[in-house]
């Protein structure tokens, strides 16, 4: 359970964080390149500058997380834009 954790600038490259509770966490400038985030809860997470390129996370909960301020693949950006639109 990493709910509310301060993960600023941390590296989670290739980490398996499936079903992880990351809600309310501070992920600013963290690196999640090719991490597995499917079915994770990232509700309300701060993602300014977070590197999400190559992740698996389409089926995670992104509600109230500012995913649009993160670096990510275009395919993920398109999928998230449909399900979790920017307010």
Q: Positions of the model-derived regions?
A:
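Tandem repeat scaffolds
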Residues: 1-87
């Amino acid at each position: 359970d990493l709910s509310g954790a301060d993960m600023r600038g941390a590296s989670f490259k290739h980490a398996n964080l499936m079903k992880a509770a990351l809600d309310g966490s501070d992920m600013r400038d963290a690196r999640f390149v090719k991490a597995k985030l499917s079915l994770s809860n990232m509700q309300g997470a701060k993602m300014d500058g977070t590197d999400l390129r190559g992740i698996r996370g389409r089926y995670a909960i992104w509600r109230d997380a500012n995913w649009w301020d993160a670096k990510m693949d275009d395919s993920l950006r398109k999928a998230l834009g449909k399900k979790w639109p920017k307010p």
